[in-house]
Amino acid sequence: MLMLMPPYHGAALKADEKGIYEHFQQISEAVSIPIMIQDAPLSGVSLSVDLLVRMARELDGVSCFKIEMPGTADKLRKLIESGGSAIEGPFDGEESITLMADLDAGATGTMPSAMIPDLIKPVVEHHLAGRREHAAEQYGKILPLINYENRQ
C-alpha cells in the first residue's frame, strides 16, 4: 500500500480540489497497488468528504483513508455514510488519541506510531468483535502512554 498526502509546499503553495484530484489520478494510473490518502492538518490542505468519496469511486486503488484532524470521528462518519462500499479502509490516526471515538464512528483500524502497536491491537480487535467494553478497558490502560507520546 502506498500512503500519500495531498500535494503542498509550505503554507502558501497548495493545489485546489481539481489539482488534488488530478494528482491522485496520475498516481492511480501509474501504480498497481492500493493507495491510502492521508488527510492531515500538517499539509494545510483541506480534503472535503465529497472529494474523498469521488476519488474512492473513480480512481483505481483508492479506497483507504487515514483521517487525522480535529473532529476525526465526525469526518469518518460522514465519509463512511457518503462513500458506502467505496470506502474500504477508514483509519484513525494521530497516535490513536481519539481511537475509541473513531472506532465508534466506523474506523476499521488505526495507524498509530510505532511505540505501542502491540498494546493498541487488542483495543481494535475487541471493538471490531463487538466487545466495546473490553476495548474501552484496554484503551483506558494505555491512554496515559498515548497522551505522553502526543506531548513529545
Where are these regions (language model features)?
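Catalytic alpha/beta core domains of metabolic enzymes, predominantly
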Residues: Q26, P41-Q152
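Active-site beta->alpha loop and helix N-cap motifs at the rims of alpha/beta catalytic domains
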Residues: M1-G44
